[in-house]
Amino acid sequence: MSIFSYTISILVAFVSYIVYQKYANVYTSFITKPVKRYDYIIVGAGTAGCVLASRLSEDPKVKVLLVEAGDHMGYFSKVPLTSTASQQGSNDWSVRATPQKYSSFGLWNQTPIIPRGKGPGGSGQINFLLHGFGLPEDYNRWSRLGFKGWTMDDLKPYFLKAFGTVRSEFDSDSCPAKGVCAKAPMKLKLIHEDNELMSIFKQASSALAAKNTLFRKATANVKDGSRYQSYDAYLKPALKRKNLHVLLKTQAISIRFEEEKATSLYILQDHRNLDNIFVNREIILSAGSVKTPQILMLSGIGPRNLIKSLQINLITDNEWVGRNLHDHMNLPIYVSIKKPISVTLAKVFSASTLVDYFWNNSGYLAFPPVAGVEYQNASALMLFSMGSSSERLLRDLSNYRPKVFRDTFPFHNDTSKEGFMFLATCIQPKSRGTVTLRDSSTSVPIVVDPNYLNREYDVKCMIKAIRRAERLLTTKPFEEIGARIHWPRPERCLTFWNYTKLDQKGLVRRRKKMKTQGAPSVQAQKEVTKPTKPKIQSPPNEYLECLMREVAVTGHHIAGTCAGGKVVDSQLRVKNVSGVRIMDASVFPAPISLYPNSVIVGMAEKAAELIKNTPRL
């Protein structure tokens, strides 16, 4: 990779960043000093908050305040391939979970780092942009858990309103000019048909067609080569409305109640200015699955013993606030290939890639590095098409110890290495974690314990995904590109399977035999020392379990901490109080099968309608 390419990359990125920052604050809705009273106060300008602020402010007679803790997002958040570059910066809460008991042994202090967006657009601005509506059974499960009115059939009108489709595979560019999808705010981009890794993955899946197997090509929230999430589709077009105020760099502290009716919101601006903003109608919490339960508990809504122990005034006892946390875990399985069809660092930083992106809105940078996903029962495999990656960036983001990272990603220093990763996951994990307070001060970090792999079901489910990956790689489409799986060798797992040692036994015996027989000929030396490609057998389940407990990491989908049916009712109203609703992923009673972001957009559309139709008392 030439110095010229690097220089051009840095220069273009720098200029783009300056331009983005210069014009980010031209909208009149951004304010620094709020008025004392609003009709609606929305906490959190994430995926749901952007939709709600846009829809509720459509009525010019109401005043809406959107409170966001973060500041404007940087330019890199707009480039689909560089989404992770925004993580662990000023626009990421970078939640550090508690040391895990059953997983994360390959991470420093067994501590997962969970990215959470901080700024307009929230996590939708730093995620991998992947679109999907889950599976119909996901919503039926919600109903069985007591969250009524949110089935797939209930949400279809809102998915159509937001996306113009109810399909998980879709391209907005194919919309007729007068079609429903052309009018929809959200835009989708389907991976190109000529993407070879996607085609190979799809062919292999078809070759091993089995019951309850579903393949989906990658679809992303992308428009004209740029990230296009709810901030772009909903909030940005509304930012010149006089009745909409957006307050950045402002943290919501707690809600004040009078006779169990929400009357105001305490806020902290720039970490120093405390203020109290009054509300006429409702406060809607859209702060995410960590911050929303934190605000509730600081407001006196949550487990009685915890609230009392922190000397917070108890408003209502609800043991479910902060419980039921669920997340997907991903186990990365590196596969090397011999055909140059994956995304590598050398390709990403080439001059041609930069020209493709900045002049044509196309190329490697214009789409997230995911080819597709295959579901089989409760397991799934995602094909992540990066053959090489930055060790420093990924290791810092995941919190891997250096040795573990280098063993898991063996070609981290080869910028031209061709390959990909299968991410093995369980789409309906049963392990449940918690979010709780350590102190009544917001300056003290909240305690987040995902409790990953606590349930044996999750282990068995992920093992099935790994076995599926093994079988897929034996199919002709993958064999033709020389696909070869790499099994890491973490020290903790060698007890269960030390394949390298077994493969080398024969070579060691031959060398010892030659030593006793005198000096070998040159030809004999060549025959002995010439490495042979080991035939690695399939590892035992015990090794796979050890491996996932060592290197599996968050899927970035934490949810469920204010579960529907437990903390909120079917109208998203917080139980036993009035004037407070919740609309974010914290209301999910159980996981959505993989990507939740598009689901949240549709749910927020319905939530806005529910709020608008609520009679004013």
Language model features with spans:
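N-terminal redox-cofactor-binding region of secreted/periplasmic oxidoreductases
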Residues: S2-L617
